[in-house]
Regions:
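Juxtamembrane/interface segments at transmembrane-helix termini
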Residues: 34-38, 90-112, 186-214
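Hydrophobic membrane-targeting alpha-helices
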Residues: 29, 61-65, 161, 187, ...
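Alpha-helical membrane-embedded segments
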Residues: 79-96, 151-156, 173-195
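N-terminal first transmembrane alpha-helix
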Residues: 1-85, 169-180
Length: 218
């Protein structure tokens, strides 16, 4: 397949991705083992965040990391692609964190998502969906900012293909980059949501109330 050799010529990236997958799998197993069936929410959160991080590494690796590392291009274009990808991802994560923090800062949401059951505080999985719904109702500035991030990342990558004398074999990587960049941003944001909702918040509630926060079925 045209361009498939570019995926195979750089074994270091595959080794890094495989190493991350192995490390996150070990981390997930350790979290489940440490929980020992008690259903502690923050340990479930650790496992979920590790899974999101592993998927993000694979998606980002298959998309823009392979593109900027394997395709021969001028150093200025390579630097521009890296800068846009890294800056855009960080901006996306910061924006997501602000949206989620705004929802978690509402006492009515905390009271609804985390129910005091006497000896423990119970959290329902439906709260994640409620959080996503509420956090997605962000202001127009945040929506425009996230839209510009996605547009800028794809525009720079496509502009490099137009202006730089890239080989035709790079088109497969270009296609995968354009296709998977939104997915990488989604999983980066999902990891941020998991950290704030399923790790930071339950740990804070456990310190305040002196009770474990557990995960329950809907």
């Amino acid at each position: 397949m045209i361009g498939s050799s570019l995926f195979l010529d750089d074994p270091l990236l595959w080794k890094i991705a495989a190493g991350v997958a192995l490390a996150t799998s070990i981390g997930q197993a350790a979290a489940w083992r440490f929980d020992d069936g008690r259903g502690r929410l923050w340990l479930y959160g650790v496992a979920a965040v590790l899974a999101s991080a592993s998927i993000y590494v694979w998606i980002a690796g298959i998309s823009w990391v392979f593109y900027v590392s394997s395709v021969p291009m001028p150093s200025t274009f390579r630097a521009a692609c890296i800068a846009v990808a890294v800056t855009g991802t960080l901006f996306w994560m910061v924006t997501t964190a602000r949206q989620v923090s705004a929802v978690l800062g509402k006492p009515e949401f905390i009271a609804q998502a985390f129910r005091d059951a006497g000896s423990e505080i119970q959290y329902s999985l439906s709260a994640m969906q409620q959080l996503s719904t509420l956090s997605n109702h962000c202001g127009p500035i945040a929506r425009i900012g996230q839209g510009l991030v996605l547009f800028a990342a794809l525009a720079v990558i496509l502009a490099v293909r137009i202006w730089a004398p890239l080989p035709a074999s790079a088109d497969l990587l270009l296609f995968s980059t354009v296709l998977l960049t939104p997915g990488s941003l989604f999983f980066a944001g999902l990891a941020v949501k998991g950290i704030l909702l399923m790790i930071v918040t339950p740990r804070r509630l456990e310190r305040i109330h002196g009770k474990p926060v557990t995960l329950t079925d809907d």
